[in-house]
């Protein structure tokens, strides 16, 4: 009887590990795909497509994955570029997308707390300057 229980436990553990690996692989695949879509849109000069791609990549957060950090940097660069060009509305869209992406990826911890703090500071500075409400 003990052997049977041990066999069931081993099978349950193996199945759980396989399911977890499949989940992580699927999430990693979608993360890479969304990042690539963001990069392609960025190269085309498509603001909305780039923001959506990078934002979606961050939503697929996997701890210690460098692509999430690259997506965050790209969104930050898009926001800064628009801010320098005087397009406050687009800058706010990008800063808010970056901030909300990390909030959306919250689970046991909130990832990207440094990005959130930086975005909060920029948003607070830019909202009073926004003309289109």
Regions found by a protein language model. Name each.
Residues 8-27:
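Hydrophobic membrane-insertion alpha-helices, especially the h-region
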Residues 42, 53-101:
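Extracytoplasmic/periplasmic/luminal assembly and interaction segments
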Residues 24, 31, 69-73, 92, ...:
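Start-of-helix signal in alpha-solenoid helical-repeat scaffolds, especially tetratricopeptide repeats
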Residues 30-47:
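Alpha-helical transmembrane signal-anchor/signal-peptide segments
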Residues 1-6:
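Cytosolic-side transmembrane helix boundary signature
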Residues 66-82, 106-132:
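TPR/TPR-like alpha-solenoid helical repeat scaffolds
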Residues 24, 28-35, 52-53, 59-61:
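Internal alpha-helical scaffold/solenoid segments in large eukaryotic proteins
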Residues 47-48, 88:
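TPR-repeat structural position
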